[in-house]
Amino acid sequence: MSPGERFLDWLKRLQGQKAWTAARAAFRRSLAFPPGAYPRAMPYVEPFLAKGDWRQEEREAHYLVAALYALKDGDHQVGRTLARALWEKAQGSASVEKRFLALLEADRDQIAFRLRQAVALVEGGIDFARLLDDLLRWFSPERHVQARWAREYYGAGASEEEKKKEVEA
């Protein structure tokens, strides 16, 4: 089980408790602060983080994903990456593509803002476990995550055309 899947399980358990209403409000409010800096969100994330040895940027990624999960009311769709969801939204919209490219270029100071914009833009849920797993590797010098996201985004149209041809055949 990946770190993202473990954290998503944690969030789903929290979502099933009475505390979810307060947690969801705290997570949503936390989007106005740097990830991990809003004290009211800490009681809902720190117990999970205490179980591991996380670097600061990894801690921030957990807080950011929790906030984005709350923003989407826990609408998790396994396998639907943010890149794919943005491609679906971008049909006929150059501005969505520009936002996607800005997201791919986001540094540590910009990532929370860019991700919040992107997640709010798409309709329906995304794979939050995969999002966290990707964020945990986002700042790697090789930029493998950003390259994969670009392939998923720009390759989505090609895969849609292939599916249509298979159905027609």
From Swiss-Prot:
Answer whether the UniProt record assigns the keyword Ribonucleoprotein to this protein.
no
The molecule here is called CRISPR-associated protein Cse2
Which lineage?
Answer: Bacteria, Thermotogati, Deinococcota, Deinococci, Thermales
Q: Which biological process terms from the Gene Ontology are attached to this UniProt entry?
A: defense response to virus
Gene3D superfamilies, per the entry: CRISPR-associated protein Cse2 (1.10.520.40)
The protein's assembly and partners: Homodimer.
Coiled-coil annotated spans: none
Q: What does the function comment of this entry state?
A: CRISPR (clustered regularly interspaced short palindromic repeat), is an adaptive immune system that provides protection against mobile genetic elements (viruses, transposable elements and conjugative plasmids). CRISPR clusters contain sequences complementary to antecedent mobile elements and target invading nucleic acids. CRISPR clusters are transcribed and processed into CRISPR RNA (crRNA).
